[in-house]
UniProtKB/Swiss-Prot annotation:
Function recorded in the entry: Catalyzes the conversion of S-adenosyl-L-methionine (SAM) to carboxy-S-adenosyl-L-methionine (Cx-SAM).
Keywords carried by this UniProt record: S-adenosyl-L-methionine, Transferase
Record flagged with keyword Transferase: yes
Name of the featured protein: Carboxy-S-adenosyl-L-methionine synthase
Family listed: Belongs to the class I-like SAM-binding methyltransferase superfamily. Cx-SAM synthase family.
Single GO biological process annotation from the record: tRNA wobble uridine modification
Lineage of source species: Bacteria, Pseudomonadati, Campylobacterota, Epsilonproteobacteria, Campylobacterales
EC number: 2.1.3.-
Cited SUPFAM superfamilies: S-adenosyl-L-methionine-dependent methyltransferases
Length: 239
């Protein structure tokens, strides 16, 4: 269904409620440049990593899994038997995920705050456009938990909206992104109203800050495997 949520001001902060869940897939595709390409790219790196590190039944966590799109991409690229666990604190999102993946016997979903979850040892984790919604003071705590639960040679994928450390470049990047959204059919008002709703809810870091954060919790190998203006996909490997 087409995202028309921001035709008028919501007069409240953005949250992942039933109204958002109803149009979320359209919102993602029209708001994140190369969204599905990044999912496929992330699935590729996890699939290749699993080939290099054979486990009996690899466990993969998708934190902030929303409507389950990444699990679809993973199942298209990974042939071996895997266990997929999606965690999200929005029940409306998980209902959508369960509907879409009802035929996927290897996927299960849990409605929980992933900051409070005790993870099992896993071959891979994904945080796709999620860390930006975690309070800055809690990001290092979460990433350290992930690092400690990641198997040796395991991989973490982090997709993020980012900012530039240069004020002028940041302004130009934002303007280009708004032009992209207009080309996707969003009006000036819709863009402004959504920006207003996301104020202090989505807090982006720079690319350098995100990489430094991952390195601070123990990752020695972090690569930006994709970047478009103010969006990036990072792959971090535990060695």
């Amino acid at each position: 269904m087409k995202d028309t949520l921001f035709n008028q001001s919501l007069n409240k902060r953005f949250c992942f409620d039933e109204k958002v869940a109803h149009v979320f897939d359209d919102m993602l595709e029209r708001s994140i440049p190369y969204y599905y390409e990044m999912l496929d790219l992330g699935a590729y790196f996890i699939a290749q990593n699993l080939k290099e590190n054979l486990n009996a039944k690899p466990l993969i966590y998708d934190l902030g899994c929303s409507t389950g799109n990444f699990f679809i991409a993973l199942n298209q690229q990974i042939q071996q038997d895997i266990e997929l666990v999606g965690i999200d604190n929005s029940m409306p999102m998980l209902k959508k995920a369960q509907e879409k993946l009802k035929d996927f016997k290897n996927a299960r979903f849990e409605c929980m705050d992933f900051l409070e979850v005790e993870f099992k040892e896993a071959s891979a984790f994904s945080l796709l456009f999620v860390l930006q919604f975690v309070r800055p003071m809690q990001r290092e705590v979460l990433l350290k938990k992930i690092y400690n639960s990641l198997a040796l040679n395991g991989v973490l994928l982090v997709g993020e909206k980012i900012m530039s450390e240069d004020r002028i470049l940041d302004k130009q990047m934002i303007e280009l992104y708004y032009l992209y959204k207009q080309n996707q059919g969003y009006s000036h008002n819709e863009i402004a109203f959504k920006r207003e709703a996301l104020e202090n809810v989505l807090v982006p870091y720079s690319l350098k800050e995100n990489i430094a954060l991952l390195e601070s919790v123990g990752f020695k190998h972090v690569e930006a495997v994709f970047k478009w203006v103010n969006f990036t996909l990072l792959a971090a490997r535990k060695t």
